[in-house]
Amino acid sequence: ARYFLVELTGGVSMTGCAIVYGCGKMGVISLRGAVFFIYLGILFVIALVDWHIQMIYDRFHIMILILAVLDFMLYPEMGIATRLTGMGIISVPMLVLALAIPGAFGGGDIKLMSVSGLLIGGASMICAMCIGIITGGAYVTLMLVRKRLNKTDQFAFGPFLAFGLATAIFLGDKMAVWYLQFGAV
């Protein structure tokens, strides 16, 4: 089942990146699409590793940082201010919570959101975190109801953050605009 999931995720990721970020010459995915396809692959590995051992290795953060620098060179239209906002808008509050409430968030989760913010920007980061909290909260609620977790147990939040980040690279800006328009009504 895992092999099928990996193959399906890879195919959907490549197709999504080609649709959203376009194809280059001769039908090959654009460079920006390739950056996000690689990012999705890293997120997938992070989700699997964190799920099993509750750890996000720094090598993954470094890879995402490299992708963020490359994307900045390929797509300077998303300015440095937007990227720096993305870097701090979620990770700084997570860090404050982790310092105030020991165990609230792991360092790997905080670093993941920081380097991802450099890549996808502030609006998408807010959407990513909302999706991560909703899906993670639904999972924990289900596990508490089934008595597979108790209130003091820790769980891997990385897979839910990764899902939120993956969703945000396709829909983050659209979701932010929708939310702002919804609030204006």
Model-based region annotation:
Residues 1-185:
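A membrane-topology feature that recognizes alpha-helical transmembrane segments
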